[in-house]
Amino acid sequence: MSVDPACPQSLPCLEASDSKESSPMPVICGPEENYPSLQMSSAEMPHTETVSPLPSSMDLLIQDSPDSSTSPKGKQPTAAENSATKKEDKVPVKKQKARTVFSSAQLCVLNDRFQRQKYLSLQQMQELSNILNLSYKQVKTWFQNQRMKSKRWQKNNWPKNSNGVTQKASAPTYPSLYSSCHQGCLVNPTGNLPMWSNQTWNNSSWSNQTQNIQSWSNHSWNAQTWCTQSWNNQAWNSPFSNCGEESLQSCLQFQPNSPASDLEAALEAAGEGLNVIQQTTRYLSTPQTVDLLLNYSTNMQPEDV
């Protein structure tokens, strides 16, 4: 039979099929009934048919890529986050306002007006803005800033006194006015009259005034005695010279310890006496009276002889 030589021819076919990349091709050697030895050879080598082929590059990529069903899904941004990002993009950047640059002449006029009047009406601000060639808003803003600066300066430079009167005062007083104020004004801020009256009456200046009155009275008495001496020293050739002396002597009868009413009466009497003397001397000093006296004396001499 020619069965044995046919079998060796089938082996190279199997070896050739294993070397290919594709699956092994079936070997057709004829019907199984005619080749009983072929069945045994196929049974002896079952591993050749079950060997898996080498994985290709496409197979590796498919295996490495995760399965969509098993792999976790990537977190997508929510609607709130998207809206927040959109708002941030839409928010415009605030532009800084350009500061107004005032000239030296404008600042001089503004400072002068601020020293005289810190609060201006609408009409006054409009007039001032027209004079300085500025807008109403610029003048208003400058006055507001200047008022804030002055308040801040007063707050920082204000003397930190523990006295509650200065802290509770509604109207601010500057340190120069505060120092010149009398201390008694701060003792009783409510303005009660008893305390004020006690302070004024118990003041040492009242006793000083009484001493000054006594010294003035002594001075007046000394002046009166000096006047009497001067009047006595003068020689008067008129018969009216005794009038002043008598009035002054009557004034000298009062003692220095007499009350003030007697002193005033004495001074008035002395003044009247002096006025009479002055009038008589003026009358006698005129040339008419001198001529009259001379004529009278000449007419009287022959009769006396």
Swiss-Prot record:
**One Pfam family of this chain:** Homeodomain
Keyword Signal present in the record's keywords: the answer is no
One annotated GO molecular function is: RNA polymerase II cis-regulatory region sequence-specific DNA binding
* SMART domains associated with the record: HOX
Location of the region described as Sufficient for strong transactivation activity in the Swiss-Prot/TrEMBL record: 241-305
Cellular location of this protein?
A: Nucleus
Any one biological process term the GO annotation gives: stem cell population maintenance
**Annotated Gene3D superfamilies:** Homeodomain-like
Coiled-coil region: none
Keywords for this protein: Activator, Developmental protein, DNA-binding, Homeobox, Nucleus, Repeat, Repressor, Transcription, Transcription regulation
Q: Which GO terms describe its cellular component?
A: nucleus
User: Does the entry feature the keyword Transport, yes or no?
Assistant: no
Q: Where is this region: Sufficient for transactivation activity?
A: 196-240
Residues of the signal sequence? none
Renumbered ranges of sequence repeats: 196-200, 201-205, 206-210, 216-220, 221-225, 226-230, 231-235, 236-240
**Record region (8 X repeats starting with a Trp in each unit):** 196-240
Bias (Polar residues) ranges: 65-83
Q: Which InterPro entries does the UniProt record give? A: Distal-less_Homeobox_TF (IPR050460), HD (IPR001356), Homeobox_CS (IPR017970), Homeodomain-like_sf (IPR009057)
Segment Required for DNA-binding: which positions?
122-151
| Region named Disordered | 1-95
Q: Which domain of life is it from?
A: Eukaryota
State the family named in the UniProt similarity comment for this chain: Belongs to the Nanog homeobox family.
Function noted in UniProt: Transcription regulator involved in inner cell mass and embryonic stem (ES) cells proliferation and self-renewal. Imposes pluripotency on ES cells and prevents their differentiation towards extraembryonic endoderm and trophectoderm lineages. Blocks bone morphogenetic protein-induced mesoderm differentiation of ES cells by physically interacting with SMAD1 and interfering with the recruitment of coactivators to the active SMAD transcriptional complexes. Acts as a transcriptional activator or repressor.
Its quaternary organisation is:
Interacts with SMAD1. Interacts with SALL4. Interacts with ZNF281/ZFP281. Interacts with PCGF1. Interacts with ESRRB; reciprocally modulates their transcriptional activities. Interacts with NSD2.
Name of the protein: Homeobox protein NANOG
Q: Which organism is it from?
A: Macaca fascicularis (Crab-eating macaque)
Species classification: Eukaryota, Metazoa, Chordata, Craniata, Vertebrata
